[in-house]
A protein has these predicted regions:
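Acidic catalytic cores of enzymes that act on phosphate-bearing nucleotides/polynucleotides
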Residues: 28, 32, 91, 185-191, ...
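C-terminal amphipathic alpha-helical interaction region
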Residues: 342-347, 351-352, 383-386, 426, ...
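Generic beta-strand/beta-sheet core signal
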Residues: 60, 84, 109, 139, ...
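Glycine-rich phosphate-binding loops that contact phosphosugars or nucleotide phosphates
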Residues: 48-204, 271-281
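A short, gly/pro- and small-residue-rich
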Residues: 121-130, 422-423, 430, 437
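Low-complexity, highly charged intrinsically disordered N-terminal segments
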Residues: 1-57, 67
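Catalytic-loop motifs flanking and including active-site residues across diverse enzymes
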Residues: 68, 170-174, 242, 289-293, ...
């Protein structure tokens, strides 16, 4: 498809630009920088009402509901804003110990309103915080289970998402803007940058979004399916968000672009470098939109629907099956790092899936594992579970069978009960680890499971 026709097809909401299925129903993100501006004053008043009552804010969310806020938190250096997207009991306890719950505000964020982790976090802090409805708000799509819960409990506020926007395209919707305003970010300036980029992405020539997507798509056709996303102090955290956008949008039907934040291209024949243009934090508004447009363009090159996620549910179903047994999963160790590396072939990548407590020390240990794979000539991606299941999980199951998957586990510690559930966070994260590895094996993926102590 020619440049002009592809760009026009996107703006005309023409599903035949991709596969001719339901793509036209998922293009609300194209206009959201205009629409969300209309509700900005209400969001500002809400945030101002909390100023004297709140010391910390905790966002409970996964995937598209958490990654844009995490990028904003890091970029604007807001240390009192916390993103909770782990089910590890030790991590949840560690966060709770930092907080004065009487002066902590909770944002429960989920488009579907049924995200298991988000609901579990919300219910946990609802109970431990004394059921103080004025210290909770929800961001969710209209009519969702979470909206009904929030209104039943009398949450301080409920902000509605736009149903025609998928989670990974929601950075410039209330899912990104409500947290931004709570952080004290000038959301009007963020959105102004996004609108400027939106206008630039309408043109046939000098279109920043098309140019980036064209590089992605052309590179894929030439065998360069791995996207090395530049990492600098200024764009810290952006790769986490871009990783989900690329992986979940393109990794399906045996195809896919493999995002690798912070990895070097080094002239490797299967890699391409992608620069990130964020000279200062407010440039995120433009960059969010540019990358969304680019990935929509790349989807046309790959001839896939960049707005669905057909393989994400499989691991969730496996997790639920494990939980339904009522027993603690037996996470038997399988294989080793060396055995997994021995299976590497040309064009493969090494993926670390860490169901362990996110800490600086564990970051270091995972870095040592990554170093071994890099020494073997492999590109490395890594993520903490269950965060990555809502980000790159679609690519792992639905993309090309070129990954070597190393699951890393630890001892999650004592059980931490989830109110209203027959299981706690310990059993939940173990079930997620068990379910994800089993799903990968069913898809014919090469896998191993080790304990983090093996990296010491």
């Amino acid at each position: 498809m020619k440049r002009e026709a592809l760009i026009e097809g996107i703006w005309e909401r023409d599903a035949t630009t991709w596969t001719g299925s339901d793509e036209a129903h998922w293009l609300g993100w194209l206009d959201e920088p205009l629409h969300v501006q209309e509700g900005l004053e209400e969001i500002r008043r809400f945030a101002e009402s909390l100023h004297d009552e709140v010391d910390d804010v905790v966002l409970c969310g996964m995937g598209g509901s958490s990654l844009a806020p995490e990028v904003l938190r890091r970029s604007f250096e807001v240390d009192w804003f916390h993103v909770l997207d782990t089910t590890h009991p030790k991590a949840i306890r560690a966060l709770e110990e930092k907080l004065d719950l009487e002066r902590t505000f909770f944002v429960s964020s989920s488009k579907s309103g049924t995200t298991l982790e988000t609901r579990s976090h919300t219910d946990y802090f609802w109970e431990t915080g004394g059921k103080r409805a004025e210290m909770f708000c929800a961001v969710t799509d209209p009519g969702s289970e979470l909206e009904h819960l929030a209104r039943k409990r009398g949450f301080h506020a409920v902000f509605a998402g736009e149903p025609s926007i998928g989670g990974r395209y929601s950075a410039l919707s209330p899912f990104g803007i409500v947290p931004a305003v709570l952080m004290g970010v000038d959301a009007a300036q963020l959105l102004e940058r996004a609108r400027e980029m939106r206008e630039a992405c309408r043109s046939g020539e000098g279109n920043p979004g098309f140019e980036l997507g064209n590089r992605f798509g052309t590179g894929w056709h030439e065998g360069r399916d791995k996207i090395c996303i530049g990492s600098t102090y200024e764009n810290r955290g952006f790769g986490l968000w871009a990783e989900q956008l690329i992986a979940e949008s393109t990794g399906k039907h045996g195809k896919g672009l493999i995002p690798a934040p912070g990895q070097p291209a080094d002239g490797a024949p299967d890699r391409q470098a992608a620069g990130v243009d964020i000279p200062e934090p407010y440039a995120l508004g433009a960059e969010f939109f540019r990358w969304e447009f680019a990935v929509a363009v790349a989807g046309a090159y790959l001839e896939i629907n960049p707005f669905d996620q057909p393989d994400v549910q499989a691991a969730k179903d496996k997790t639920n099956e494990v939980l339904a047994t009522g027993k603690e999963p037996d996470l038997e160790l399988q294989g080793s790092i060396d055995e997994l590396l021995a299976e590497a072939q040309e064009g493969n990548y090494f993926c670390i899936q860490a169901f362990i407590q996110p800490t600086p020390e564990n970051d270091r240990l995972l870095g040592e594992i990554a170093g071994r794979a890099e020494t073997a000539g492999l590109l490395v991606t890594n993520g903490y579970g269950p965060r990555y299941m809502h980000s790159t999980g679609q690519l792992h199951k639905g993309g090309p069978n070129t990954g070597l998957f190393l699951q890393v586990i630890d001892d999650p510690g004592d059980e931490l009960p989830i109110p209203g559930k027959p299981f706690g966070f310990r059993r939940l994260i173990q079930a997620q680890a068990a379910g994800d590895l089993e799903t990968l094996k069913e898809r014919g993926r090469r896998v191993a499971r080790i304990h983090i102590e093996e990296a010491i």
